[in-house]
Regions:
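Extended substrate/RNA-proximal surfaces in nucleic-acid metabolism proteins
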Residues: 58-189
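Conserved, mostly hydrophobic/aromatic
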Residues: 9, 51, 110, 157, ...
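Flexible inter-domain linker/hinge segments
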Residues: 237-256
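An N-terminally biased module of ancient metal coordination in phosphate/nucleic-acid-related enzymes
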Residues: 1-102
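Histidine/acidic-residue-rich catalytic or RNA/ligand-binding cores of hydrolases
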Residues: 16-19, 58-62, 167-175, 203-204, ...
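Glycine-enriched alpha-helix->loop->beta-strand junction motifs that scaffold or abut catalytic
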Residues: 156, 186-189, 208-214, 231
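Short acidic/histidine-rich active-site segments
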Residues: 211-227
Length: 256
């Protein structure tokens, strides 16, 4: 076992050929530059890029794998220059029946082991999102429905920045996550706290007692990568090992 650093929430601003992905993110924030920044400047061992369901980004990933600097792992993830494991993710905005019956919106980060999985996920989600090429567009499904689609393609779902007043579960949808996910709540084994909260706040909520807390950068530019990150204890860097750490299985865990 050894300790690694993981930032599981990094956006893409533009595709390699300049097509917009996250409008509010920097143009320099593309797939290849994120991998390079983590490997050469930030010392991040595992990075979750959460705009990989965009067909433009999928094309970039396919080209990235042809460079010879990266390859897919059997246990999930893409290894770049034997230094960084890239997790292929998608941030999805769900439509929830919020407090007092009003409609609310919440963000979820979903991760998949292999490129084929997120390609299939992207294809299915294109029926629920008007513009699948852009980042975090609102879907017409709830978190309760989304988790089934994510699992269908071997993925995991983490409710994102759960306390943020704008577009989060506790922020504008519900007082209890269990009210959203119902009998599927046990399938949620980790939550992202977000930049506006910490473990002291989260520890006050009883339904989060057995959930793993993660904190990430939500980077919209290269310098913002790793402004917040997680320290994990794992056997190696892969999708499978990250899932074990999030579940606190077999000695894998989030240390800080």
């Amino acid at each position: 076992m050894y300790e690694v650093f993981a930032d599981l929430h990094v956006h893409i601003g533009r595709s390699e050929n300049g097509k917009p992905i996250k409008i509010t993110a920097a143009r320099s924030l593309n797939f290849a530059n994120i991998a390079k920044e983590c490997a050469e400047r930030k010392g991040i061992n595992i990075v979750g890029i959460i705009d990989c369901a965009s067909p433009y980004v999928i094309e970039d990933i396919e080209n990235f794998l042809k460079t010879g600097d990266a390859y897919e792992l059997k246990d999930g993830g893409i290894i770049y220059k034997d230094k960084v494991c890239i997790l292929l993710g998608s941030e999805v905005e769900t439509s929830e029946k919020g407090r007092n019956g009003k409609c609310g919106a919440a963000h979820n980060v979903c991760f998949f082991p292999h490129l084929k999985d997120i390609k299939a996920f992207s294809n299915e989600m294109s029926h629920h999102i008007k513009n699948i090429t852009l980042s975090t567009q609102r879907s017409d499904i709830s978190g309760y429905e989304l988790i089934d689609i994510v699992e269908k393609y071997n993925g995991i779902l983490i409710p994102a920045h759960i306390f943020t007043p704008f577009k989060s579960y506790y922020g504008n949808c519900t007082d209890r996550l269990e009210n959203i996910f119902k009998e599927k709540y046990d399938k949620i084994f980790a939550v992202e706290l977000g930049l506006s909260s910490d473990t002291f706040l989260a520890d006050e909520i009883s339904e989060l007692e057995n959930k793993t807390f993660v904190t990430n950068s939500d980077a919209h530019s290269l310098p913002k990568i790793a402004r917040e990150y997680n320290k994990m204890q794992v056997e190696d860097i892969s999708f499978k090992e990250v899932v074990k750490a999030l579940k606190n299985e077999d000695g894998r865990k989030i240390i800080a």
